[in-house]
Each structure stands twice: as C-alpha cells, then as structure tokens.
Amino acid sequence: MATINQLVRKPRKRMVDKSDVPALQNCPQRRGVCTRVYTTTPKKPNSALRKVCRVRLTNGFEVSSYIGGEGHNLQEHSVVLIRGGRVKDLPGVRYHTVRGSLDTSGVKDRKQGRSKYGAKRPK
C-alpha cells in the first residue's frame, strides 16, 4: 500500500485497454480489396476447410478475414467490407467479411438468420 506522500510524488498509472481489432482504427467497418482468397484448416479438435481472404484495407493495413456462410463469390481484386470478430479456431483471423455488401454476395437459399448473411427475404 502506497503512502499519500508516495502517491503525491508519483500518481497511479491508468490501465490502457488494447483493441481486439486494431486495423479498424475505432471504426465499425472498413473497406478493402482482396489480395488472396484461400481455404485453411482449423486448430486441433476441429476439422474443416475454412474460407478466408487476405484483405488490403483503405488505411494500409493487410488483414486476414473470414468469409462466413455456404459458398461465396469472392476472388482477387474483389472489394469487400470488413467488420471485427475473430474466428476462435483460426489463429490470426480477427475479422469477418460482411456478406451482401459491395462485391460480396449474400448467401443463397438462406432462410434463417438472414441478416447476418445478407440474404433477402424469400417470397
């Protein structure tokens, strides 16, 4: 326990909280261009081919972003919108692509949870 005199001489340090999504620079989303679209395998207990793209953002950052949903139309030079949100079983993937905006199509034949995948309401 510090004495009052010690605290007068040297006040307590404030804790600085580190951002989980530094490339967004306090913005809700960021636009970027795909530099590489590929699949990768998840960490130990899980097994799949997860769809991921490498994106060069408008602020100069280059990040890996997960493409959610079944099937996608992304290729190199596609313009995408990136939001925060990591993928727990893919190390280094801390962003998600927003489906149904810019060059990213929505998920086809999606009936439930449509807003998360940019799918229109079925007639």
Curated annotation (Swiss-Prot):
Keyword terms, alphabetized: Methylation, Ribonucleoprotein, Ribosomal protein, RNA-binding, rRNA-binding, tRNA-binding
GO CC annotation: ribosome; small ribosomal subunit
Compositionally biased region (Basic residues): 113-123
Region (Disordered), start-end ranges: 100-123
Residues annotated with 3-methylthioaspartic acid modification: D89
UniProt KW rRNA-binding keyword: yes
GO BP annotation list: translation
UniProt entry tagged with the keyword Transferase: no
InterPro entries listed in its UniProt record: NA-bd_OB-fold, Ribosomal_uS12, Ribosomal_uS12_bac
GO MF annotation list: rRNA binding; structural constituent of ribosome; tRNA binding
Family: Belongs to the universal ribosomal protein uS12 family.
Role noted for this protein: With S4 and S5 plays an important role in translational accuracy.
Known partners and oligomeric status: Part of the 30S ribosomal subunit. Contacts proteins S8 and S17. May interact with IF1 in the 30S initiation complex.
NCBIfam families membership: rpsL_bact
Protein's name in the database: Small ribosomal subunit protein uS12
Organism: Pseudomonas aeruginosa (strain ATCC 15692 / DSM 22644 / CIP 104116 / JCM 14847 / LMG 12228 / 1C / PRS 101 / PAO1)
